[in-house]
């Protein structure tokens, strides 16, 4: 029976003989030119058919069959593999060595505080009504900024910046301004036209004047947490948020010139129905944000204490969750939205959709991005950074984070230094997640490998997916088909060496 390996491996007798004279050299040169022209034509043809290539089809039978647990691949290897052997000392050494590359920088700030706890939340957060907790935390963040900045050359530009949480808008307007001022004190930020500066906003914590301030201090993108407008659902998850609050922030963002507005929804929450969720979705479509994130609620009460407040019997059954996802996917695609991947949709003219068509889209801990070559510095409790071929994570408990900072120590407590195999597999997984296609020759040139030989144990795992119409594999590469786009995590798992080594439950959320 013919397998993927048979499809992409050339026959042994197909190796061309070496040219013996000038005429043969000329023939070879002409062949190379012809191949280059064909490649250029193929690239132009791909661009011309971009809309067709970005279609997404929801196949319920396939979704059910492939609905398993798996990583989200915001990193590879995933954080499960991080090790305390990679400590602050090694992290600092890697950062200094990275200056030779001259790569631009990306900054992620974690602001962990929330006024109230949302019962569905799996983020690292501190629920408190005490706003006075913010300043001692920010004072430590400023000290960390100083320590981190000392590791990087001052001419390395910050092209990407993100405030996440928690709830970044928990801090006061004066503290927001101060945090951005301190950031500019220690790092050089790109100008507004080139920088991607984003913030996560809880509309209950922001009003028009807050949005005006955020634009003034440099933010040009935002994501709004909505989840669902249905009042019964909101009460069940302890997040009461009116539609008017959301619309006020969205309209203010447009008035102030924010270049990208994203809205987050969650399906699978208590009491959700197809009709109820579609009512929320229709209202969101009417206001036409630039991007939408449709997240699957992963109910893991044994790991996340707030989720214990959600009764299992109040959750929609699996078939209803799938019905919600199907209705949402079909409604958005029929309305002209493109499925970027990993729960994200965008309008065809959005920069993420354009970057995906151009082959320049990237994915990291901050989600999809158009800034691929940045070294990412994580600032604040539990933040994760990516510098050169390493990942490093800060302390996850506030007290230990404070202790490190107060003693003049970088708070990095674990991480991983990628070997060549890790880097190669990360490249393959990133290409698939971002572009839904893989060019074998390009990977072979970049990594000096024979793809079929190197991935001899991975490629056979795709056989069943090919038969099911999720993807196509030939001697040129892999192309994910419309039915396979929603199952891209399953496809990437075939190239994950760490999953091969695991036995028993792997502890990740469901892919759908």
Where are these regions (language model features)?
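Flexible, acidic/Gly-rich N-terminal and inter-domain linker regions that tether
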Residues: 1-105, 154
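C-terminal scaffold of the Radical SAM
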Residues: 3-10, 97, 104, 127-151, ...
């Amino acid at each position: 029976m013919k397998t993927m390996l048979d499809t992409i491996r050339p026959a042994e007798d197909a190796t061309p003989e070496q040219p013996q004279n000038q005429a043969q050299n000329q023939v070879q040169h002409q062949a190379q030119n012809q191949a280059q022209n064909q490649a250029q034509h193929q690239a132009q043809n791909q661009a011309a058919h971009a809309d067709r290539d970005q279609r997404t089809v929801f196949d319920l039978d396939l979704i059910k069959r492939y609905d398993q647990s798996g990583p989200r691949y915001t990193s590879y290897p995933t954080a499960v593999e991080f090790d305390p052997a990679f400590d602050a000392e090694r992290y600092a050494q890697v950062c200094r060595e990275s200056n030779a590359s001259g790569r631009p920088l990306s900054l992620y700030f974690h602001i962990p505080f929330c006024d109230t706890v949302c019962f569905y939340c799996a983020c690292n957060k501190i629920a408190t009504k005490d706003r006075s907790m913010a300043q001692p935390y920010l004072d430590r963040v400023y000290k960390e900024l100083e320590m981190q900045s000392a590791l990087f050359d001052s001419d390395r530009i910050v092209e990407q910046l993100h405030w996440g949480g928690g709830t970044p808008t928990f801090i006061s307007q004066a503290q927001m301004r101060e945090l951005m001022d301190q950031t500019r004190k220690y790092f050089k930020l790109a100008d507004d036209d080139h920088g991607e500066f984003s913030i996560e906003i809880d509309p209950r914590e922001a009003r028009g004047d807050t949005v005006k301030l955020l634009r003034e201090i440099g933010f040009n993108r935002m994501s709004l947490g909505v989840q669902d407008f249905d009042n019964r659902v909101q009460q069940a998850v302890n997040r009461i948020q009116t539609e008017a609050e959301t619309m006020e922030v969205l309209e203010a963002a447009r008035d102030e010139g924010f270049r990208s507005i994203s809205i987050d929804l969650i399906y699978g929450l208590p009491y959700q129905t197809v009709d109820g969720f579609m009512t929320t979705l229709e209202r969101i479509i009417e206001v036409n944000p630039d991007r939408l994130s449709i997240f699957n609620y992963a109910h893991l009460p044994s790991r996340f204490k707030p989720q214990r407040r959600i009764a299992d019997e109040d959750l929609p059954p699996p078939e209803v969750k799938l019905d919600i996802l199907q209705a949402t996917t079909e409604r958005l695609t029929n309305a002209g939205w493109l499925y970027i991947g990993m729960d994200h949709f965008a309008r065809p003219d959005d920069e993420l959709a354009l970057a995906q068509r151009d082959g320049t889209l990237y994915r990291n801990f901050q989600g999809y991005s158009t800034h691929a070559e940045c070294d990412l510095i994580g600032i604040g409790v539990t933040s994760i950074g990516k510098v050169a071929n390493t990942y490093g994570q800060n302390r996850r408990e506030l007290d230990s984070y404070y202790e490190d900072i107060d003693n003049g120590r970088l708070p990095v407590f674990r991480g991983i230094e990628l070997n060549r195999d890790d880097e190669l597999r990360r490249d393959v997984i990133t290409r698939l997640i971002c572009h839904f296609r893989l060019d074998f020759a390009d990977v072979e040139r970049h990594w000096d490998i024979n793809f079929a030989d190197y991935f001899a144990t991975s490629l056979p795992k795709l056989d069943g997916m090919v038969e099911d119409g999720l993807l196509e594999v030939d001697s040129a590469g892999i192309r994910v088909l419309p039915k396979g786009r929603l199952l891209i995590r399953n496809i990437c798992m075939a190239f994950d060496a760490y999953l091969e080594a695991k036995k028993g439950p792997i502890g990740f959320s469901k892919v759908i």
